[in-house]
UniProtKB/Swiss-Prot annotation:
This is L-lactate dehydrogenase A chain. PANTHER family: L-2-HYDROXYCARBOXYLATE DEHYDROGENASE (NAD(P)(+)) (PTHR43128), L-LACTATE DEHYDROGENASE A CHAIN (PTHR43128:SF10). One of its GO terms (biological process) is lactate metabolic process. GO terms for molecular function: L-lactate dehydrogenase activity. Substrate binds at residues 106, 138, 169, 248. It comes from Sphyraena idiastes.
C-alpha cells in the first residue's frame, strides 16, 4: 500500500463536475498577471486558466501562482498555450496584444492587434461558446468592437473594460482634492478610454450634493478652482505611470477584478464599460464607447440613460466619429 492509501480511506468515488466559476486570462504580461492576481485575491473563481504564446513565461507565471496556493481559495490554477485549457470558462479576459512602437500610427497598431485577435477570439469561442468576453487590450473600444464582430456573440456578452479605470482615477483625484475617500466622491468618465474621454461634470456629487450647483463653472473655462485639471490628470495619469515605471498594471488589474466580481456574483452594479452605443446620445455609427452599464450573471444587462449637457454629448459624438474613422479602415 502507498502512503496515500494508508493515510486516506475513500468513502465514495468522486464524479468530476467541472468548475462553476472558471475565469480565463489571455496574455500573461503585466496587465494580464495583475488582473489574474487581483481575481485570485478577491476569491472570484474556483479555477483560473492562463493562456499565452510565450510558453516559458506562461509556465513560470503559473508555477509562481501555484506555489502561493496555500494562501488562496482557488483550488485549480492552470496554463497552456493550447486554448483547450480555457474550456467552459464563465468569463474570459483578453489582455493580449501588440505594443505601440515608436513612430507607429494608431491605425497600424490597431490592425496588428486585429490580426492577433483573429487567432485569439475564434479559439475562445470554440472552447467557451457561452462565456462573457471582456476586452482589456488597447485601444480597448476599437478592439471590443473587433471582438464582437469576430466572436458572433450577442452585444451583452462582449464588454470592454472601458473607462472603469478612468472613472476610478477621477474619483481618486477628486478625493485628494476634497480630502475624502474615493468611494464618497461620485463622478463618471464616459466615452473613449484615454485621451478623448468625457468627464460628466453635471453628475459630479458628494452625498447627493451636486458640485456644479456649488460651483457653476466647474470643469469650464473661468473656474478659479481649475477643476478641469482633475480630468487632465486622469488623462495624463497613465502616461505618467508609464514614464515612471515603464507600464501600468495594478490599477487596471484591480479594475478588471472589480468588473469580473460584478459578473460572477450577479451584483447588478453600474460600471462605465465599453458597449455598442449606436443610437444613443446622437451616435450614428456602430462603435463601442463607455456609458454606465449594469453588469450581472448574463453580462451587460442594462444601460443607464445619462442626462448629458449638450457640450458633453457633443464630445461623445466626436469620440464616436474618430473611432469610426479608424474602424472603417480595418480588415476583419
Amino acid at each position: 500500500m502507498s502512503t496515500k492509501e494508508k493515510l486516506i480511506n475513500h468513502v465514495m468515488k468522486e464524479e468530476p463536475i467541472g468548475s462553476r466559476n472558471k475565469v480565463t486570462v489571455v496574455g500573461v504580461g503585466m496587465v494580464g498577471m495583475a488582473s489574474a492576481v487581483s481575481i485570485l485575491l478577491k476569491d472570484l473563481c474556483d479555477e483560473l486558466a492562463l493562456v499565452d504564446v510565450m510558453e516559458d513565461k506562461l509556465k513560470g507565471e503559473v508555477m509562481d501562482l501555484q506555489h502561493g496556493g496555500l494562501f488562496l481559495k482557488t483550488h485549480k490554477i492552470v496554463g497552456d498555450k493550447d486554448y483547450s485549457v480555457t474550456a467552459n470558462s464563465r468569463v474570459v479576459v483578453v489582455t493580449a496584444g501588440a505594443r505601440q512602437q515608436e513612430g507607429e500610427s494608431r491605425l497600424n497598431l490597431v490592425q496588428r492587434n486585429v490580426n492577433i485577435f483573429k487567432f485569439i477570439i475564434p479559439n475562445i469561442v470554440k472552447y467557451s461558446p457561452n462565456c462573457i468576453l471582456m476586452v482589456v487590450s488597447n485601444p480597448v473600444d476599437i478592439l471590443t468592437y473587433v471582438a464582437w464582430k469576430l466572436s458572433g456573440f450577442p452585444r451583452h456578452r462582449v464588454i470592454g473594460s472601458g473607462t472603469n479605470l478612468d472613472s476610478a482615477r477621477f474619483r481618486h483625484i477628486m478625493g485628494e482634492k476634497l480630502h475624502l475617500h474615493p468611494s464618497s466622491c461620485h463622478g463618471w468618465i464616459v466615452g473613449e478610454h484615454g485621451d478623448s474621454s468625457v468627464p460628466v461634470w453635471s453628475g459630479v456629487n458628494v452625498a447627493g450634493v451636486s458640485l456644479q450647483t456649488l460651483n457653476p463653472k466647474m470643469g469650464a473655462e473661468g473656474d478659479t478652482e481649475n477643476w478641469k485639471a482633475v480630468h487632465k490628470m486622469v488623462v495624463d495619469g497613465a502616461y505618467e505611470v508609464i514614464k515612471l515605471k515603464g507600464y501600468t498594471s495594478w490599477a487596471i488589474g484591480m479594475s478588471v477584478a472589480d468588473l469580473v466580481e460584478s459578473i460572477v456574483k450577479n451584483l447588478h452594479k453600474v460600471h462605465p464599460v465599453s458597449t455598442l452605443v449606436k443610437g444613443m446620445h446622437g451616435v450614428k455609427d456602430e462603435v463601442f464607447l463607455s456609458v454606465p452599464c449594469v453588469l450581472g450573471n448574463s453580462g451587460l444587462t442594462d444601460v443607464i440613460h445619462m442626462t448629458l449637457k449638450p457640450e458633453e454629448e457633443k464630445q461623445l459624438v466626436k469620440s464616436a466619429e474618430t473611432l469610426w474613422g479608424v474602424q472603417k479602415e480595418l480588415t476583419l
